[in-house]
């Protein structure tokens, strides 16, 4: 059976095409939509950056750090760059799953962006 992304999965994908301050190229992303939505072929995914990009993004107040989360993937989840992507077309593959508190924190940041 083919992989179906689920909320809390860290996946590998390529964010091109993109423009402006959006993340470009191959990166990891955090899936925030659930399986029912994802079965339609789309998934809501926030890109994850590492290194200097992650440090700079922390000044936005819209990122969630993976440092100390117990994941192999480190860096910052960019909640301000949430994207709806056709995960089949982007050949998304599973890397690992984050603890629930990371998902909760990311969803809270997105809620603040949209409703505050």
Predicted regions and their residues:
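Conserved functional hotspots at enzyme active or ligand-binding sites that engage polyanionic ligands
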Residues: 1-116
